[in-house]
C-alpha cells in the first residue's frame, strides 16, 4: 500500500477508534456516576488529545470510516498480521446501538408493543443526506418490529430513507419535526442536526411520556429536567 493511501486509511481508522474508545468509556461512566461531558472536557484540554471526536453517542457511520477500517483489517489479514485494535473498534461500534436500545427497554420494561416513538435524524451525520451505514437506520430496523409505530423526521433525507426502509410497514415519515410527535410516547434523537438544538419545550411535554432519548448527547439534561422532561443520554 503506498504511504499516501495508508495515511488516509490510518487517519480515518484512528478517528473511528477514538469514537469507539469514548463510547466504551461511556459504559464505565454510567456505572460510576461519572459524566461524559466533564470527561470530554478533561480529556480535550490535553493538547496531545484535543476535543474533537470525543462525544459519546450511537457510534460512527457513513462511507469513509467503516470502509477504511475494513481496508486496514483486510490488509492485516492478507499480510498475516494479528488483528487487534481495529477489530475491537468495529465490535464496539456495532454494540453501541444495543447499549442505547437497552435504555429504551429499561424505561418501558421491554413492553413496547403499544408504543409510538418519534425518531429525529436519519443521516449518519448532520448536514448530509448520506444514509450509508447510518446508525439511525439500524436502530429503526431493530426497533420497528417491537413497537406499534415509528414516526420519522429528517430535514433533508426523508425521500431516500423511504426507499431504504420500504419493507417496514409500521413507520411514517413527516415533513415537520413537531408533527412527527403525533400520538408519540417519546423522542429518540439519532442525528444532531442544528435545528434540533433549539427545541420547543411545550411541544416536548406533549409527548405522552415526556421523555427524550438523546443518542448524540447534545441536549442539556439539566435544562430539560427543569422543564419536567425526562432526559436519557449516554454516560451522563
Residue ranges and their predicted role:
Residues 1-236:
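Structural/interface elements that position substrates and couple domains in central-metabolism enzymes
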Amino acid at each position: 500500500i503506498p504511504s499516501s493511501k495508508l495515511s488516509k486509511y490510518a487517519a480515518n481508522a484512528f478517528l473511528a477508534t477514538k469514537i469507539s474508545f469514548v463510547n466504551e468509556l461511556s459504559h464505565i461512566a454510567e456505572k460510576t456516576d461519572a459524566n461524559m461531558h466533564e470527561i470530554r472536557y478533561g480529556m480535550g484540554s490535553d493538547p496531545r488529545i484535543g476535543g474533537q471526536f470525543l462525544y459519546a453517542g450511537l457510534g460512527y457511520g457513513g462511507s469513509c470510516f467503516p470502509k477504511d477500517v475494513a481496508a486496514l483489517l483486510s490488509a492485516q489479514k492478507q499480510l498475516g498480521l494479528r488483528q487487534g485494535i481495529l477489530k475491537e473498534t468495529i465490535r464496539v461500534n456495532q454494540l453501541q446501538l444495543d447499549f442505547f436500545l437497552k435504555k429504551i427497554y429499561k424505561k418501558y420494561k421491554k413492553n413496547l408493543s403499544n408504543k409510538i416513538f418519534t425518531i429525529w435524524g436519519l443521516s449518519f451525520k448532520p448536514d448530509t443526506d448520506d444514509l450509508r451505514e447510518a446508525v439511525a437506520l439500524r436502530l429503526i430496523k431493530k426497533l420497528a418490529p417491537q413497537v406499534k409505530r415509528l414516526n420519522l423526521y429528517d430535514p433533508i433525507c426523508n425521500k431516500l430513507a423511504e426507499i431504504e426502509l420500504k419493507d417496514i410497514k409500521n413507520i411514517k415519515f413527516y415533513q415537520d419535526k413537531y408533527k412527527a410527535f403525533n400520538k408519540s410516547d417519546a423522542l429518540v434523537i439519532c442525528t444532531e442536526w442544528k435545528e434540533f438544538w433549539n427545541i420547543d419545550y411545550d411541544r416536548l411535554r406533549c409527548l405522552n411520556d415526556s421523555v427524550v432519548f438523546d443518542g448524540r448527547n447534545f441536549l442539556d439534561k439539566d435544562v430539560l429536567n427543569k422543564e419536567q422532561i425526562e432526559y436519557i443520554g449516554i454516560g451522563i
